[in-house]
Amino acid sequence: MEDKTVELQFITHFTDTYSYYDSARMALEGGCRWIQLRMKDTPVDEVEREAIRLQGLCKDYGATFIIDDHVELVKKIHADGVHLGKKDMPVAEARGILGKEFIIGGTANTFDDVKMHYKAGADYIGCGPFRFTTTKKDLSPVLGLEGYRSIILQMKEANIHLPIVAIGGITLEDIPSIMETGITGIALSGTILRAKDPVAETKR
């Protein structure tokens, strides 16, 4: 399967300091070229308004624009793709709606999750959490480096080739050791937004 991911993915997160738009803009200014709009528990019309703004911003930077959860919205506005969490629509159902031209990512916490998404036609996996994180409710069991090594090894044994993006409580210092496990990329949110200079943090 063609690798449609990039090494750094940024997931928007609303804070007291930054709006969704501002957080995405700073990540893009810092060199990130993959933005995922994540607005859980928000009315779909609000998500659509924000998505259209961010889609234009991503086009200006030549970045990939992914929307979390909202499959029909992705199709409606022609975003680049959708990311589906464990409680969202199944990947196979989303693929049936979107067809082959859209990117579909799925969340995984175990090798069985990865295998299921692979068979369903996912383009990449968001795998985590690496450690405890406050940016997500209903957290799955923490994986750590050993969890990633185990999943990557089982994928090799099963001849499954799929980009795996690590997510969940990752700091800048964690990235070299995570990448050594065979992980394809890193997804960040809070680490960038908590920095004194989010643009500089993204560049680092």
Give the residues covered by each predicted segment.
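Histidine/lysine/aspartate-rich catalytic loop segments that bind and position anionic ligands
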Residues: 111-141
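Contiguous, function-dense segments enriched for cysteine-driven chemistry
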Residues: 143, 190-191
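Glycine-rich beta-strand-to-loop/alpha-helix junction loops that act as flexible
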Residues: 127, 165-170, 186-190
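Flexible, gly/pro- and Lys/Arg-enriched active-site loops
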Residues: 84-92, 132-155
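C-terminal binding/interaction regions
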Residues: 181, 185
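Conserved N-terminal beta1-alpha1 strand-loop-helix module at the mouth
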Residues: 1-89, 96-111, 115-123, 150-153, ...
